[in-house]
Design a protein with these regions (language model features):
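Conserved N-terminal structural module of periplasmic/extracytoplasmic solute-binding proteins
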Residues: 4-8, 21-124, 138-139, 184, ...
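Short helix-initiation/N-cap motifs at beta->coil->alpha
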Residues: 87-97, 116, 189-194, 267-281
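Extracytoplasmic/periplasmic substrate-recognition and gating elements
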Residues: 75-76, 180, 260-264, 300-367
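Extracytoplasmic/periplasmic solute-binding protein
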Residues: 154-163, 168, 193-241, 256, ...
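Short, solvent-exposed loop/beta-turn-alpha elements that line the ligand-binding surface or hinge
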Residues: 43, 131-144, 208-210, 214, ...
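Long, aromatic- and glycine/proline-rich binding clefts that accommodate carbohydrate-like moieties
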Residues: 151, 309-312, 362-419, 423
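Hinge/lid segment of periplasmic solute-binding proteins
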Residues: 115-167, 204, 220-227, 247, ...
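Glycine-centered hinge/linker elements that transmit conformational signals in sensory
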Residues: 196-198, 238-269
């Protein structure tokens, strides 16, 4: 695996590069000449064109907003660009479908990409560098929320823009908490677990206290990060010291014991997220951790079910801890014309406008991705409403949230860890010690 990745990296070349010059008039003239030459190579859309966009925004509220957003762009852009969307399921499904399509030479021009997939596609030279368009249009990259640029840059190129990024939220049933004598959201994992046990005991085992689905780079990553400060993968993306420093062993043992004791829900084998939410809406689950990207959908469904919903910061060992996840939009440069790439950039630029960013957050719960959007009256007024406190929380905890390192190993390591977690927590086929041994074996192959 490692040899293939290195080979891919060696073949990666930059399409555009600038040499910083200064001082003499001669140097300045050369610099200006180079800039003009570079800008002349950046296409502007000349004729009406249709481009495709593959995404994971298939839930009710997500899809409704996406359609509204695309319809507005299609009607208002001055170039005659038509964007056609194709839902692919979840982000992992987008990655799988895109991999197949690229191999067949039939890929979309745009895709919403996961943190797992971005380094793979970037290292293979699949993603177009947006830098020339950014420079031509004076797009301010400093306006993009710094913490959300972790998967934007690759080898000095801008290969994505943050689009459906999110943190996690603790969604909890306020009435169940109140009935158990709990009048505030937990401030640490230890406190959350204490609450969960109390709710479980008070219901004679009828109501689980808390639940997590299996998402190694997201829900489990931040719990590990609260133990070891790096999560499930090292900061350089080249190893997993959590396997040797005791943090993974502690987490595997704890999670197994929580579910064994009954108060922590075991995620379903299929449609785990939907199943867990249904238990919550039916009053069978006191709290669960899910993405802020689902805040609007969860809020609406909880209200319809008569659930008094609370939304709070996520917690890890010893205090607050949160993950960063979600998707970033990339332009697929491989096998596409400069006209298609230019059209795709116009859509990306539209999505990054203040009003689009603000409404994307309001309508769905995904994070606002630009500082200027946070300063709009649209967002300020929305956050000022007490019932939207959870949305504001999602943005406030970004500064302390973490995501796995951008690494070409992330996708494969994520798959291996997910499989072992499933064997331990869902199938109950192995012990925590066996799970750790299996992970060490997988790591020795992946990070060889």
């Amino acid at each position: 695996m490692k040899r293939k990745v290195i080979a891919a990296l060696l073949t990666l070349t930059m399409v555009f590069s600038l040499t910083a010059c200064g001082g003499s008039k001669s140097d300045s003239s050369k610099d200006s000449s180079k800039k003009e030459e570079k800008e002349s190579t950046v296409d502007t859309v000349k004729d009406p064109i249709t481009i495709s966009f593959w995404h994971d925004r298939t839930s009710d509220t997500d899809y409704a907003w996406l359609k509204e957003s695309i319809d507005e762009f299609n009607k208002t852009n001055k170039y005659g660009i038509t964007v056609e969307e194709v839902g692919q399921g979840y982000l992992d499904d987008v990655q799988a479908a895109l991999t197949t399509a690229i191999a067949a030479g039939d890929s979309p021009v745009l895709a919403d990409l996961s943190c797992n997939g971005i380094p793979l596609f970037a290292s293979e030279g699949v993603l177009a560098d947006m830098t020339p368009y950014i420079e031509r249009d004076n797009f301010d990259m400093d306006n993009v929320v710094k913490e959300l640029t972790d998967y934007v840059y690759y080898d000095k190129q801008v290969v994505t823009m943050p689009y459906t990024r999110g943190t996690a939220i603790l969604y909890y049933n306020k009435d169940l908490y109140a009935n158990a004598g709990l009048n505030q959201a937990p401030t640490s994992l230890e406190e959350l677990n204490k609450y969960a046990k109390k709710i479980y005991d008070n219901s004679n085992g009828e109501v689980k206290g808390v639940g997590y689905t299996i998402e190694p780079t997201y829900y489990q990553h931040y719990l590990l990060e609260s133990l070891n400060n790096v999560g499930f993968m090292d900061a350089d993306g080249k190893g997993a010291s959590c396997l040797d420093d005791g943090s993974m062993k502690q987490f595997l043992t704890d999670w197994y014991n929580w579910t064994e004791e009954g108060w922590c829900e075991i995620p379903a084998l299929e449609n785990a997220s939907s199943a867990m939410q249904e238990d919550f809406y039916n009053g069978k689950l006191g709290a669960f951790v899910s993405s802020s990207n689902r805040a609007t959908s969860i809020s609406e469904k909880a209200q319809a079910a008569g659930i008094n919903l609370g939304m709070s910061y996520t917690v890890g060992y010893g205090g607050y801890s949160a993950p960063l996840g979600g998707g970033s939009i990339g332009i697929i440069g491989k096998d596409h014309s400069q006209q298609e790439i230019a059209a795709a950039w116009e859509f990306v630029k539209f999505l990054m406008s203040d009003e689009q960013v603000a409404q994307n957050h309001i309508k769905t719960g995904v994070l606002p991705t630009t500082y200027s959007s946070v300063e709009t009256d649209t967002l300020k007024d929305f956050w000022a409403d007490e019932k939207n406190e959870g949305y504001k929380i999602s943005y406030e905890q970004v500064k302390d949230a973490s995501a796995p390192a951008m690494s070409m190993y992330t996708s494969e390591w994520n798959s291996a860890v997910r499989s072992v977690y499933s064997e331990l927590i869902q199938a109950r086929d192995i012990t925590p010690d066996q799970a750790l041994d299996n992970l060490k074996s997988e790591a020795s192959t992946i990070f060889e």
